[in-house]
Curated annotation (Swiss-Prot):
Residues 380-393, 405-425, 453-466 have a biased composition (Polar residues). This is Actin-binding LIM protein 3. It holds the Pfam family VHP. It comes from Mus musculus (Mouse). One of its GO terms (biological process) is cytoskeleton organization. It comes from the Eukaryota. GO terms for molecular function: actin binding; metal ion binding. Residues 614-682 form the HP domain. The gene is Ablim3.
Length: 682
């Protein structure tokens, strides 16, 4: 018997848009509340009994011969009666030798006690007797025959010769025959209703066949679900073991299962389906958009996160590899070449890695942050979480501060060595390079130089930066700095890189690096660096290679920014001895930021398009951006359907999500998607 509960068809169901759900009974389209039974849908008014027409949506029903029938009609048509009380049986049923009983009616005919599980049952005509009562009925004393004896077969008196005692009656030896074929029974026989039969005739007329071997069963029989088996033929399809007396068994079609084996098979089927589906790559129990969702790929015997693979530069050699194989994930770990990068545990420090390994880690982390965060820009003053950078306002005074205030959500924070001796303990950060020499990355040293020549060369840029902070009518005292100019410096997530190349052996260094790196991804990254260096020298927008022009180009690294009300800063390249000593610096152009040597300052506003990934988003009312089914509300043509929330004004954004845009962007991706679904903007 089955039950069904009506449910509301969701208007946001993915099936509602393309596949129309039709009623199984009338064929019309289902709208509103419907009933689903065996993958068939019905209107509530159409889901009725096939016999009497009563509603089945709120009651039990039976499915027989492709018809849905109520309980009463099913019992009248196909119901089973108890052999003891003659009532219809619903629920549990006990079958024995073709007879069915209620569990409460299947008791011993003599002692009226229920049969113990696994106990033997003796049938005597229409009575069933337990094993204890059957032993008391059996007597070892011979049957006393009083008076003349008559044959039960020919009804004549037995006078001379031998007589046969069978079925509690006396027979002539020649009269004890099979009722069907009249063969004299001298050996085993089977009786039914007091009439003897030979074994073959009894099986042909009343016999029971085994479902497994298709042979007749004589002796002990095992019955389950209306099917009969030899005790040795009923075996579990999984473990191939026999069933003991009284043991529970599951019947699926023609297969018999132990309860434990059936549960194990269901678990394996679910696990196999999970591994073969797309969600097998994600952690168990996670939902789509969860931060723990990890999809990995295998390229050239290396395991890469799909974000890392998608964020790699579009080099021809990368896209010539075969399609990545989907593999199972291992959370909180990253793999590169065995010779270059070892598996970093939570307690290991990056200071133990080689400079080449650090550079590969930094490139992979940078590309991963670019691909995962749309508002991130590769600049010394932008943070991945969109936090406001704080710099020293004055170009004449620098105070050393923490190198980074970010923390990685998937890695524990590691100890780093401070570049300058100070009593202040810098916050721990996974991406800080080692304290040893590294030609691919040098952290800037924020302090004033004592070198007079360096200060003279940067005087012009400093005056311009200093004058830009005051009105034209005001001339500040050069020996006095206002209180607002002293801001504690917090390092940016991406410190400027200073590359120092030797005059004669820079190409040889790259060749040696290429030979050392056996990792395919590491070799591709170094090839990209060499290609960028060679193209930067031939770039017509890059100044000639001279000490003067390189210093002029490096002046463009000074920034004047105002991000969420944070103080502006001026960082001049001449104040850093590591950068001022370099011969030239290749020009990097990423995310569309092409900075020319004449652009000394880069203005950033928290309200401009940079916050939304360098794209202008036209503002629309919230009602025009709602996502509905079947195209009832058509979206404007120029909107970004994957970023509908970015077309809202600040006031409507706060009314819809209850938070500002910057707070919304700091949320995890899965959390943002959930909020957008609730607001019908997803």
């Amino acid at each position: 018997m089955n039950t069904s509960i009506p449910y509301q068809q969701s208007p946001y169901s993915p099936r509602g848009g393309s596949n129309v759900i039709q009623c199984y009974r009338c064929g019309d389209t289902c709208k509103g509340e419907v009933v689903r039974v065996h993958n068939n849908h019905f209107h509530i008014r159409c889901f009725t009994c096939q016999v009497c027409g009563c509603g089945l949506a709120q009651s039990g029903f039976f499915f027989k011969n492709q018809e849905y029938i109520c309980t009463q009609d099913y019992q009248q048509l196909y119901g089973t009666r108890c052999d003891s009380c003659r009532d219809f049986i619903t629920g549990e049923v006990i079958s024995a030798l073709g007879r069915t009983y209620h569990p409460k009616c299947f008791v011993c005919s003599l002692c009226r006690k229920p049969f113990p599980i696994g106990d033997k049952v003796t049938f005597s005509g229409k009575e069933c007797v337990c094993q204890t009562c059957s032993q008391s009925m059996t007597s070892s004393k011979p049957i006393k025959i009083r008076g003349p004896s008559h044959c039960a077969g020919c009804k004549e008196e037995i006078k001379h010769g031998q007589s046969l005692l069978a079925l509690d009656k006396q027979w002539h030896v020649s009269c004890f025959k099979c009722q069907t074929c009249s063969v004299i029974l001298t050996g085993e026989y089977i009786s039914k209703d007091g009439v003897p039969y030979c074994e073959s005739d009894y099986h042909s007329q009343f016999g029971i066949k085994c479902e497994t071997c298709d042979r007749y069963i004589s002796g002990r029989v095992l019955e389950a679900g209306g099917k009969h088996y030899h005790p040795t033929c009923a075996r579990c399809v999984r473990c191939h073991q026999m069933f003991t007396e009284g043991e529970e068994m599951y019947l699926t079609g023609s297969e018999v299962w132990h309860p434990i084996c059936k549960q194990a098979a269901r678990a394996e089927k679910k696990l196999k389906h999970r591994r073969t589906s797309e969600t097998s790559i994600s952690p168990p129990g996670s939902s789509i958009g969860s931060p723990n969702r990890v999809i990995c790929a295998k390229v050239d015997n290396e395991i890469l996160n799909y974000k890392d693979l998608a964020a790699l530069p579009k080099v021809k050699s990368i896209y010539e590899v075969q399609r990545p194989d989907l593999i199972s994930y291992e959370p909180h770990s990253r793999y590169t070449s065995d010779e270059m990068l070892e598996r970093c545990g939570y307690g290991e420090s990056l200071g133990t890695l080689s400079p080449y390994s650090q550079d590969i880690y930094e490139n992979l982390d940078l590309r991963q942050r670019r691909a995962s965060s749309p508002g991130y820009i590769d600049s010394p003053t932008y943070s991945r979480q969109g936090m406001s950078p704080t710099f020293s306002r004055s170009p004449h005074y620098y105070r050393s501060g923490p190198e980074s205030g970010r923390s990685s959500p998937y890695h524990s924070q590691l100890d780093v060595r401070s570049s300058t001796p100070t009593s202040y303990q810098a916050p721990k950060h996974f991406h800080i390079p080692a304290g040893e020499s590294n030609i691919y990355r040098k952290p800037p040293i924020y302090k004033r130089h004592g070198d007079l020549s360096t200060a003279t060369k940067s005087k012009t840029s400093e005056d311009i930066s200093q004058a830009s902070k005051y009105s034209p009518a005001y001339s500040p005292d050069p020996y006095y700095a206002s209180e607002s100019e002293y801001w504690t410096y917090h390092g940016s997530p991406k410190v400027p890189r200073a590359r120092r190349f030797s005059s004669g052996g820079e190409e040889e260094d790259f060749d040696r690096s290429m030979h050392k790196l056996q990792s395919g991804i590491g070799r591709l990254i170094l090839k990209e660096e060499m290609k960028a260096r060679s193209s930067s020298y031939a770039d017509p927008w890059t100044p000639p290679r001279s000490s003067t022009s390189s210093r002029e180009a490096l002046h463009t690294t000074g920034y004047e920014m105002s991000f969420n009300g944070s103080p502006r800063s001026h960082y001049l390249a001449d104040s850093d001895p590591l950068i001022s000593k370099s011969a030239s610096l290749p020009a990097y152009r990423r995310n569309g930021l092409h900075r020319t040597p004449s652009a000394d300052l880069f203005h950033y506003d928290s309200m401009n398009a940079v916050n939304w990934g360098m794209r202008e988003y036209k503002i629309y009312p919230y009602e025009l951006l709602l996502v509905t089914t079947r195209g009832r509300n058509r979206l404007p043509k120029d909107v970004d359907r994957t970023r509908l929330e970015r077309h809202l004004s600040q006031e409507e954004f706060y009314q819809v999500f209850g938070m500002t845009i910057s707070e919304f962007e700091r949320l995890a991706l899965w959390k943002r998607n959930e909020l957008k679904k609730q607001a019908r903007l997803f």
